[in-house]
Amino acid sequence: MAVALGCAIQASLNQGSVFQEYDTDCEVFRQRFRQFQYREAAGPHEAFNKLWELCCQWLKPKMRSKEQILELLVLEQFLTILPTEIETWVREHCPENRERVVSLIEDLQRELEIPEQQVDMHDMLLEELAPVGTAHIPPTMHLESPALQVMGPAQEAPVAEAWIPQAGPPELNYSATGECQNFLDPGYPLPKLDMNFSLENREEPWVKELQDSKEMKQLLDSKIGFEIGIENEEDTSKQKKMETMYPFIVTLEGNALQGPILQKDYVQLENQWETPPEDLQRDLAKLVDQQNPTLGETPENSNLEEPLNPKPHKKKSPGEKPHRCPQCGKCFARKSQLTGHQRIHSGEEPHKCPECGKRFLRSSDLYRHQRLHTGERPYECTVCKKRFTRRSHLIGHQRTHSEEETYKCLECGKSFCHGSSLKRHLKTHTGEKPHRCHNCGKSFSRLTALTLHQRTHTEERPFKCNYCGKSFRQRPSLVIHLRIHTGEKPYKCTHCSKSFRQRAGLIMHQVTHFRGLI
């Protein structure tokens, strides 16, 4: 399989190579791109922008040609279709070019003597791995089809019981009769098969159902062999010693690379009759856990044990914040919140405005900023129909209608709707002007006033009209200008119902109504 695919890849990728440029950082960005989850982002805009950024960091379109990018994509797909162990083995060897990738796989196949198609090594492994004191089941006991072949009473070498284990946790206990107990953990139980029924029992109704069941076919096709036999009393003592040994299980397909190494360790331990070391136990535990046993329901009226229910998934309790920032110790409920918070420490601002080039920490901030260029004001006051770009501005404005003024100046007694307004007002009492222009030395009490002033020196006009292309230094000037194109006149006279684009126009008009009274 891999040889044919390798030849195809080698024939199609014969121009240039990017392996030497494919460093560890590229692999990190590739994994982050493939493993990125939607829940890690605050919304669809941030998720799309993050995927775009990770893809560019991985493929580097500004540095690589289209052919090199295609080569990387084909390489990734080629490694993906390989068996898991071969893919891991190839990545660990860090081949310097594509020819080396193909040759590594071909050398590995020749070393292991694995055909291109599926190989059945069942009998060979049973011969090599059968421990001392065990005997093979006679050919009549080999379960080669879904029909259970049961040894008759006239066999010369009868076996007490035969057990076909499915992959499970690392600890097995064997009774004196060779019965396998506690093979699987409580979360994934494996029913026990009573192999001591007579030929007449095969005619019972549930036997046919068990033979044709999907679960039994999975057991018979699982490519796992493990046989236990007790022939005489002398072998019984060795069998009891084997009960303390860690069981050795090798899958023929999923772990072909790990099998020979573990087999060698097992033979050494078998000769010593000692408890296996912890490192071997961990390797065997990983090997067994990879099988992920799954079985269905137990047939009715059978002597199979009832399986236990799997352990329920642990739910996160309300208010739990498992994600902790290593810099400041602040905790968050979601990983995406922690990711956004860590940008504060790193100073990263990945979201850039295409109009003015200003960068932002979050995509939501960029989206809100772009309203300054488009003039969009989605939040409208239901009382005076005035519109705002931010919800917080609308809430503050609505307080003017409800006459809610919670912030009071202790100097003059004046009240304000916002704390920022009170803070700005206090500077009038102290005369504080902390913001100074470096060009002309003029000082301002507000940073926004300094920003607007500096545009007079730089002649910067960041607010551009999308209709006529005219630019403005301030956003309010753009908003007023846009009303010329839209025909909007939000300021209405309460006396004659005449409307105006600007508030100043309304005030000048209202003077005409009161001119005779003055």
UniProtKB/Swiss-Prot annotation:
Positions of C2H2-type zinc fingers: 323-345, 351-373, 379-401, 407-429, 435-457, 463-485, 491-513
GO terms of biological process kind: regulation of transcription by RNA polymerase II; spermatogonial cell division
* Primary location group: nucleus
UniProt biased composition (Polar residues): 292-304
Please give the CDD domains that the UniProt record associates with this protein: FYVE_like_SF, SCAN
- Family per similarity comment: Belongs to the krueppel C2H2-type zinc-finger protein family.
Q: What is this protein called?
A: Zinc finger protein 449
Give the organism the record lists: Pan troglodytes
Q: Species lineage, top-down? A: Eukaryota, Metazoa, Chordata, Craniata, Vertebrata
